[in-house]
Amino acid sequence: MDEQLLTALAEACAPFGDGRFHVCELTIVPGDGRLCLSGRVLDEATLTAVMIRLQQRLPDARWDSGDVRVLRGAAARPMTVATNLTGLQRQPSWLGEQQSQPRAGAAVEVLEEDGRWVFARLDDGYLGWMYRDYLRAEPAPAPTHQVGAPFILVYAAPNYLAPVVTRLFAGTPVAVEPGENGWVHVSSAAGQGYADPMELRPLDDKRPLDARRRQLAHHDALQFIGVPYLWGGTSVHGIDCSGYAQLLHRLAGVDIPRDADVQFAAGRPVEPPFAPG
């Protein structure tokens, strides 16, 4: 392959090299006076941007992108995480690197399948492989609250002696309805039952980002003392540094990105004196 072609393609794909958010895996196949692209890209916007860059770099070349597979096309379909916690893996295997752990109710866009694994996009743009059996086609119940404790147990009846239906982790969205005997009925993508309302927080909390919410984040942070470090973890079973920061903000009603470098890029400088939260 001509070195000039390889360089042009590499430069055209360079802006889409972060595999956490992009797919741009292309090769050039010469034929019939044209330069044919094959491979896969995440979406039409990626393919369009690559084609523009190639045409600018090699204006006399005739390009054909008809064989490129666009993942976010008509075949993509929405699904929902239907277990309390699952992995977003770099490869279609539990033995590969874990990138994150979506909770019950997380929206998933399935882009392609490989046996019992699917390559998926989360609603925050992260990409990875997920175990197909832990997803379902039905959307999660429309949430009104999120789990505010490190974890809660959901019971089949409104008492602590009833069978446990499931365990839900901090930050999991749930739909809450009035229950009985001081309990509330909760519905999630991982199951429904009864829970203690003191362990839930409304999603429509309109309190300003003031000292009260900073104090809440400080209080929540202390609840995770002793939790083991787990690369890609997001729960009391194991959590990493950026997942911990994201979860504490989520519990305080603030959405921030998943990974530390993206969190840093999205932040702003603050000046001393620094305060907890």
Sequence positions of predicted segments:
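N-terminal targeting leaders
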Residues: 1-95, 99-101, 106, 132-137, ...
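Soluble non-cytosolic domains of exported or imported proteins
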Residues: 3, 212, 235-239
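Boundary regions of SH3-family modules and the immediately adjacent low-complexity/disordered segments
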Residues: 24-25, 48-77, 93, 114, ...
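Short, structured beta-strand/loop micro-motifs enriched in basic residues and often containing a Trp
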Residues: 84-93, 149-159, 259-267
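Loop/turn positions that initiate beta-strands
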Residues: 105, 168-174, 276-277
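Active-site nucleophilic cysteine motif
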Residues: 221, 233-252
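...with weaker cross-activation on analogous glycine-rich loops/strands in unrelated enzymes
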Residues: 254-277
